[in-house]
C-alpha cells in the first residue's frame, strides 16, 4: 500500500517468531523494490519503502516496544539514506503510551473496548454493519488472490534459483 506522499508500506502481522526473522524482513524489502521499477527505469525513482512487522512477542529481545532498523555507513556512523526502512513493533508491550494503547486496541475484539475513537468507529463499521461485512469479505478475497499470486511468483523464482525450472 502507498500513502499520499508515495511511500510504500508492507505491514506483516506475525504470530510466530520464525515469521519475523531479519532475513525475512530483508526479503520483503527487496521484493518491494523489485516490484517498484520497470526495466530501464532510473534507480532514483525507487520509492521510499517501509516493512513493518507487528509481532506478538519481542522477537529482537531487547525489551523495547518498537525497533527502527536502518542502514549505516559504519566508518562514519552516518545514515545510508537509501529510504529503505524496517520496523519491528512488539505488540506484547501494551503500556500506557500511545503505541502501547494502539497495541491494546489491536488485540481488542469489541469496538467498545478500543481506546482510539477513529479505530473504534471503523471496527464497528466493518464488524457490525452489513456494508462493513460485505467490504471485509471482498477485501479478504483480494488478500487471498494477492497471496496466491505472490506465492506462485515466489515459488517460480525459488525454482529457477534452485535450477529446477
Regions found by a protein language model. Name each.
Residues 1-85, 95-97, 150:
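Accessory alpha/beta interaction modules
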Residues 2, 9-14, 94, 99-165:
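Short, charged alpha-helical interaction segments and adjacent helix-coil junctions
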